[in-house]
């Protein structure tokens, strides 16, 4: 009975001795660790205090101090610590002084533009001798930098503008001619006129001396009345036979066709258009022969706003249509002398291809024009005009029959193609519109 308590006392004493040993170990290790951490935190606190820092005139500014206002090295720092840090940063930016940190990578933005938005707080090296060369970059006519060894600015090539201005690191090629941008479209400025009666065109583009006889030809890209400024042509008005913007691209096989085309000639003037019944009364209009330029020859533009880049590929859209929506900022080549390929089909009086077996050109069916001209791969029917023109001696008989004018119900008219007389059949009468059919019933 007496031995049990002694055993329990022995066990209890051993556990207490173990706890005492652990406490002694903690006492020997804990304070040392605590003191080391406290000393580290104290050193950091002392280093980050806004205490006095050495001003070393002539030495580079302490970059960490310039950014944060603190310095962990304190009085032992070998760099300069201006008393008024904010004022020093502002003065450095105004003077264009940037830190020279030999051994650090060079600031690429500073080398290309001569400026640095971080100023004295930038952690990279800013060599002054290289910056002097970079700041002498040449500017183009629009005020954007010319950097031939760099890539071309894609945004500038598309829009003609660059939001980075003279600080852009890419190349901005010189525009070929002086341009006037009107709502995203580029036009060459109007030519001065020697006529005594001049006035200023009160449109989107001002201060253009123009004659009262100046003509306005709408661009084929914007049919009808458009919100875009129309192209202004010099006083020698260009006659457009039968609303034909492709007159210089088509040839006529007979003089009769030229006379017919000239008889119904139309002009684009300051108003929408005015018809001229004959060519005898021309007035101030200059003479112009339709189809005077044969097919397959060179057509030379009198004034072009499209750039010539011989070392670049040719602009395919320009080679097909003679137009380019990018204007003077297009990065492809636009030769002044453009070979007009000879079309492999007959052309209408508008200079558009007649392809009876192909689908009808959607743009032509809506607006009556086609920007692709003779190179369009779709059909451009003339409505009631037959395909059997002088330029198409071997036309399709079915197409002629469908497009030939339909005579009255009880009349017999000669067939313009075969020379035979025929009476309108039931199938032909089904093609007559309901309005004409009702008119025929009333007439009968």
Curated annotation (Swiss-Prot):
GO MF annotation list: DNA binding; mRNA binding; zinc ion binding
Pfam hit, one: zf-CCCH
The keyword Aminoacyl-tRNA synthetase belongs to this UniProt entry's keyword annotation: no
Keyword set, alphabetical order: DNA-binding, Metal-binding, Repeat, Zinc, Zinc-finger
Organism: Oryza sativa subsp. japonica (Rice)
Residue spans, zinc finger C3H1-type: 56-84, 101-129, 147-175, 309-337, 355-383
Name of protein: Zinc finger CCCH domain-containing protein 63
Region described as Disordered: 251-276, 405-444
